[in-house]
């Protein structure tokens, strides 16, 4: 008998833990995963701390088939999730051409500049 694939969600952010921001992504993700037969088995919330993010990523990826993250992927210096994911899996991180193209198209459409800070969002492990 086969079981459904499992997933975990790692929610990242001091603003979540302090109550300043309410996470709305878990509810949406759980519903969408259920529709396709994937069981969301655990949700963990950690602070904007690189060691906490890296450790949680390693622990969750060892226990579940897929790990989704929410938070810390913006254009500011404190958005460190991508770097922590790279560290958790011991892989290199750099700007990916397809991600750069998506961001360039978006910012061109909105009439805003794709600056270095925004280009950080195209960095993928």
Roles of regions detected by a PLM:
Residues 65:
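Conserved acidic residues
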Residues 18-21, 52, 77:
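Secondary-structure boundary/capping motif
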Residues 2-43, 47:
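Glycine-rich phosphate/diphosphate-binding loop of Rossmann-like nucleotide-binding domains
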Residues 47-58:
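Structural motif
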Residues 14-15, 72-75:
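Short glycine-rich anion-binding loops that position phosphate/pyrophosphate groups of nucleotides
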Residues 79-125:
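Proline/glycine-rich low-complexity loops and linkers
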């Amino acid at each position: 008998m086969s079981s459904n694939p499992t997933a975990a969600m790692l929610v990242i952010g001091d603003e979540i833990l302090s109550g300043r921001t309410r996470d709305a992504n878990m509810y949406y993700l759980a519903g969408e995963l259920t529709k396709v037969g994937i069981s969301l088995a655990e949700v963990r919330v950690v602070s904007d701390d690189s060691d906490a993010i890296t450790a949680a990523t390693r622990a969750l990826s060892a226990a579940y088939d897929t790990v989704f993250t929410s938070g810390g992927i913006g254009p500011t210096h404190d958005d460190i999730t991508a770097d922590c994911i790279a560290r958790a899996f011991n892989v290199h991180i750099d700007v990916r051409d397809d991600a750069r193209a998506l961001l360039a198209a978006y910012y061109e459409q909105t009439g805003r500049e794709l600056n270095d800070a925004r280009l950080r969002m195209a960095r993928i492990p």
